[in-house]
């Protein structure tokens, strides 16, 4: 069975990862013989998108932290079996906007839940699947929140309402994950001009995944 390439895009809110993903897509399609599939978490398929709406609804500020975690994991499982795995089996290049690292950073470090438990639950839901490459877009938490506030086209969600300290804990979690997984996670300084970040992201993908 042909195996595709699985790349995740990670980063705190306001890092610009989604913008970079969209920007490099046309160039990647020219470089790859198979299809290039883009998707997101939570979401990507109908059931997971419905769960996304529940999680991010600004009216659900009383959501319990463990409830939030389990909803993310449920969405991830459905997305995996319905979208990610079928595309990888076809040998396609799959780019996903957030994956397991988001849960560990946000629910583990950000919410203060047991990071090992968060990791175990996610591994259970994904049968241990890990991306071949993870691009982590790093930016100071205050800069990220300022970008969100200035982006009038972006819809505000429940996580945007969190205090700065929460976002700093999330960033700290991401940095620790990057330190612990140097073979998989490549850190990109996302505080630089967007064009530089886009250039770096495309170069890393070509070097690590497309030129072997």
UniProtKB/Swiss-Prot annotation:
Gene Ontology BP term (one): dUDP biosynthetic process
A GO-annotated cellular component: cytosol
Keywords: ATP-binding, Kinase, Nucleotide biosynthesis, Nucleotide-binding, Transferase
UniProt: ATP binding residues: 11-18
Pfam families, alphabetized: Thymidylate_kin
Entries under InterPro entries matching the protein: P-loop_NTPase, Thymidylate_kin-like_dom, Thymidylate_kin_CS, Thymidylate_kinase
Gene3D superfamilies on file: P-loop containing nucleotide triphosphate hydrolases
Catalytic activity: dTMP + ATP = dTDP + ADP
GO molecular function: ATP binding; dTMP kinase activity
EC number: 2.7.4.9
N-terminal signal peptide: none
Class of the enzyme per the UniProt entry, highest EC level: transferase
Function: Phosphorylation of dTMP to form dTDP in both de novo and salvage pathways of dTTP synthesis.
Family listed: Belongs to the thymidylate kinase family.
Protein name: Thymidylate kinase
Organism encoding this protein: Streptococcus mutans serotype c (strain ATCC 700610 / UA159)
Gene: tmk
């Amino acid at each position: 069975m042909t195996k595709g390439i699985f790349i995740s895009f990670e980063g705190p809110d306001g890092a610009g990862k989604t913008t970079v993903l969209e920007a490099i897509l046309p160039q990647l399609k020219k470089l790859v013989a198979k299809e290039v599939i883009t998707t997101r978490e939570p979401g990507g398929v109908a059931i997971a998108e419905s769960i996304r709406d529940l999680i991010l609804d600004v009216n659900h500020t009383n959501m319990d932290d463990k409830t939030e975690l389990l909803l993310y994991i449920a969405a991830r499982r459905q997305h995996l079996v319905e979208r990610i795995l079928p595309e990888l089996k076809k040998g396609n290049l799959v780019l996903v906007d957030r994956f397991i690292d988001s849960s560990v950073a946000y629910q583990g470090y950000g919410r203060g839940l047991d990071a090992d438990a968060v990791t175990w639950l996610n591994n259970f839901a994904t049968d241990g699947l890990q991306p071949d490459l993870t691009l982590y877009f790093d930016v100071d938490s205050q800069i990220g929140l300022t970008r969100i506030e200035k982006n009038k086209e972006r819809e505000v969600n429940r996580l945007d309402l969190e205090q700065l300290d929460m976002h700093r804990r999330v960033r700290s979690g991401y940095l620790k994950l990057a330190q612990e997984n140097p073979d998989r996670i490549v850190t990109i300084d996302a505080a630089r001009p967007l064009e530089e970040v886009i250039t770096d992201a495309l170069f890393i993908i070509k070097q690590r995944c497309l030129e072997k």
